[in-house]
Structure formats: structure tokens, C-alpha cells
Amino acid sequence: MLNPFRRVQGERARAPHSKAGTGAAGEERAAAMLCGMGWRILARNWRSGHLELDIVAQEGDTLVFVEVKTRDADGMQRPYEALTAVKKERLLRAAQAWLAANDAWNRPCRFDLVCVAVRSGTYQTELIRNVIEFADIGTRHAVGGGNASWQPW
């Protein structure tokens, strides 16, 4: 039986291809792209309970909560199509938790999406700014001025 974790002489052992591995590689590419644009990465894979933020970055004075979606370029779903209404709700709750944990309620914030398409080991990244608008999340959330700072009251 073939052991996918065995070390082959003269070659690095590699983990089998997995969704988690592809996602992690996409997040690496996304972080590198943002740093290359002069952004400062404040947190990666930040968690609060079951909530997670892929990347929390700073562009100028603005905090940016970045969701990263990585997909096969030849697949049926494009990366941006994976950002559903349910995912947007979870991102908002995660951002509120991050703002509370870091006493950053007075900071301007926004949500961006980095789409990573993979084809034959090549990664193509695209940044989409402001993927969550005030109209997307409705009025039942305490979000202050839409794209500005989210306030808990």
C-alpha cells in the first residue's frame, strides 16, 4: 500500500493535496501581495471561539478585514462566489470581536476579499475592496456609518 507521507530519497516529503493545504497556500500568497502593496499585517488566522478572520491588515489609518478565498482556476466556482451572505454575517461578528479584543472601535474599517485562483501550481491573486457594504448586512447590526467604524451601540 502506498504511504503518502513516506520520505523518498533525494526529495522532500510532501503532504497530500488537500483543501486546507490549498487554502493555506492561498493565504500566504494573499499576505505577500498585501505586504507588497505596503499594507501592514496585524493578525493572521485570528480566532475567537468559532469565528475566524483570515487576515487583519492596516492600510494607512484603515483597518482591513481580509477574507481569502482560494479555488482551482478550472473549477466550477470562482473564489468570490464563495463569499455568501452567511459568511458575510460571520465575518462581521468576527470583526466586531477583533475590534473589542483590541480596543479599536474608533478606527475606520472595511472588508476586502482576496481571490486566489490556482492553475498548475501557479497562483493568481486579485483584491476586491469593500466586499461588505452597509446594505449587505442590514440594520440589525450595530455598524455605525456603514463603511466607517463599527460601534457596539
Give a label for each model feature:
Residues 1-44:
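Acidic-basic catalytic patches of nuclease active cores, encompassing PD-(D/E)XK
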Residues 11-12, 70-120:
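Catalytic cores of nucleic-acid endonucleases
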Residues 17, 21, 25, 50, ...:
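Residues at secondary-structure transition points
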Residues 34, 53-75, 91:
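Conserved catalytic cores of phosphodiester-cleaving nucleases, focusing on short active-site segments
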Residues 48-51, 121:
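Short acidic/glycine-enriched loop/turn segments that link adjacent beta-strands
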Residues 50, 63-65, 108, 125:
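Structural motif
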Residues 101-153:
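Domain-level recognition of nuclease-like catalytic cores that cleave nucleotide substrates
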